[in-house]
């Protein structure tokens, strides 16, 4: 179980927790999230979003970047991104970046 559940919003700054790593698996020829005793194989869209989850960018900035890149409706992309990130957070594969001291 995840030690702390988060609620994802556009203000969130998501990142993978220390125990989870996004890696390209040469054997499977696909991206995977590796965590202790768990492996998740996200689809290509999820991988693109996860690569933007660096703890510095807000969900809002991620949505803006994707909406611009794909010339898509921001509201629709926003709904999908928040739902996907919330699902990963609920499963313990995503956490909120800690505030850093100035």
UniProtKB/Swiss-Prot annotation:
Q: Give yes or no: UniProt keyword Hydrolase.
A: no
| Domain of life per record | Bacteria
Recite the UniProt keywords alphabetically.
PQQ biosynthesis
Q: What's any GO biological process attached to this entry?
A: pyrroloquinoline quinone biosynthetic process
Q: In which pathway does it act?
A: Cofactor biosynthesis; pyrroloquinoline quinone biosynthesis
MF terms (GO), sorted A to Z? quinone binding
Pfam families, alphabetized: PqqD
- What is the similarity comment for this entry? Belongs to the PqqD family.
Q: What does this protein do?
A: Functions as a PqqA binding protein and presents PqqA to PqqE, in the pyrroloquinoline quinone (PQQ) biosynthetic pathway.
Q: How does it assemble?
A: Monomer. Interacts with PqqE.
Name this polypeptide is given: PqqA binding protein
- Natural source organism: Rhodopseudomonas palustris (strain BisB5)
Task: Give me the gene this protein comes from.
Answer: pqqD
């Amino acid at each position: 179980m995840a030690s702390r559940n988060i609620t994802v919003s556009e203000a969130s700054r998501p990142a993978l927790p220390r125990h989870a790593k996004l890696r390209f698996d040469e054997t499977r020829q696909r991206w995977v999230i590796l965590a202790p005793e768990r492996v998740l194989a996200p689809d290509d869209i999820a991988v693109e979003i996860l690569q933007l989850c660096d703890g510095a960018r807000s969900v809002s900035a991620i949505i803006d970047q994707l909406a611009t890149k794909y010339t898509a409706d921001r509201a629709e992309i926003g709904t999908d991104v928040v739902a996907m990130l919330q699902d990963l957070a609920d499963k313990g594969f995503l956490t909120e970046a800690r505030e850093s001291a100035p």
